[in-house]
Amino acid sequence: ADLANGAKVFSGNCAACHMGGGNVVMANKTLKKEALEQFGMYSEDAIIYQVQHGKNAMPAFAGRLTDEQIQDVAAYVLDQAAKGWAG
């Protein structure tokens, strides 16, 4: 996966709601490692599925982003979660 591309995709498509790994709509459903683990989302496959299909207030990005962009952003989210979203 291309983490630099994932960062670019995140910035352009995800950061409005998930800046710094947070969640402006549902405060407990963050992209922080603990929350991802708690909700069974701490894997690339789980994140890819969520990005593709959306859930609740989160829109589906399948058809808006390529499979490669979605894979890259999932890898970026996991990488950032492991680093505590410290940059």
Swiss-Prot record:
One of its GO terms (molecular function) is heme binding. Pfam families: Cytochrome_CBB3. Keywords: Electron transport, Heme, Iron, Metal-binding, Photosynthesis, Thylakoid, Transport. One of its GO terms (cellular component) is plasma membrane-derived thylakoid lumen. Binds 1 heme c group covalently per subunit. The keyword Phosphoprotein does not apply. Heme c binds at residues 14, 17-18, 58. GO terms for biological process: photosynthesis. The keyword RNA-binding does not apply. It is found in: Cellular thylakoid lumen. It comes from the Bacteria. Gene3D superfamilies: Cytochrome c-like domain. NCBIfam families: Cytc6PetJCyano. Monomer. Functions as an electron carrier between membrane-bound cytochrome b6-f and photosystem I in oxygenic photosynthesis. HAMAP family: Cytc_PetJ. Belongs to the cytochrome c family. PetJ subfamily. This is Cytochrome c6. It comes from Synechococcus elongatus. The gene is petJ.
